[in-house]
Amino acid sequence: MSSIVRAAISGFNETVGGIRAAQEKFKDTQEHFVSLMVFCDCEKRLVYDKVPVDKIPELTSKDYRPCCCTPLYDAMGISLSALRNDIKDKNDATAVVTIITDGLENASKEYRLKDVKALVEDLTNSEGWTFAYIGTNQDVDKVSEDLSIRNSMAFVDNEDGMSAAWNLESNSRMRHFEMMSADFCATQGMSSQERKLFRSRKNAETKYYDEDNENQNNNDKKA
């Protein structure tokens, strides 16, 4: 990601701004926290760990310095397992997980593909988590399918491509939060586990990256 680091940082900060807007818009039904793991062969580090969105400082080049190899499976396995353990006893807690990488897995030591795939499937089907995969310099559809991630997007490996990917991600996330707010009213009276299964079924039926809808919205703005 070193060639597009400026766009990656800017896009992340804009996405956090969108989550803040969602927090305000849906404050009666949602409370948002943000985690960010950066990873390479040198380190796998949580920059933010379940920080309330209104307390997230701006990400800078001091926080994010990509280099060397891509231990994708380790980064996913470590961060997802930790988050699952942290929120397992919190009623109605769920997660929207976006994975962004400019390269294929090539450096993991603790987790294998089958381990991460099983973890994603369990969190998706049993806990109602939402996963999205954004990548470049790879067959994104195949990689996401191998990981059992239903939502994926490829981007062009330059600043414009990275910016466009972040824009679609931010808009998709806001639509997802709107859906979650509507579902909150529809699931009153359900048990916590019933709500998780409801979210899982709804996620399976819904396109997270609805590019047709995105294009229509852009055309409406121009008109």
Language-model region placement:
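Acidic, low-complexity intrinsically disordered regions
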Residues: 1-223
